[in-house]
Amino acid sequence: MSLITVTNNNLEELKNKEVVVVEFWAPWCGYCKRLAPVLKTVAKDIDIMQVNIDDFEELSESYRVETIPALLVLRNGIASEPLI
């Protein structure tokens, strides 16, 4: 399993997976940097897709991400309430 950076090439994978954990983050976010080692450890067991909100602002807005870091579980593209 791994951390997967969302790009234009794999964006549809995010929406089409049955279940996926998604982290919304930004490189300038201090809390995101502090969470990174934890996610790296967790990603040994599950895939986590990472969305840089600066690169995918519309996607962040469509999932109503208001603060970062934000962790969501998507089931068939539908988001749960944020985990953090």
Regions flagged by a language model, labelled:
Residues 31-45:
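Typically the conserved alpha-helix immediately C-terminal to a functionally engaged Cys/Sec
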Residues 2, 47-49:
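Conserved beta-strand segments of alpha/beta enzyme cores
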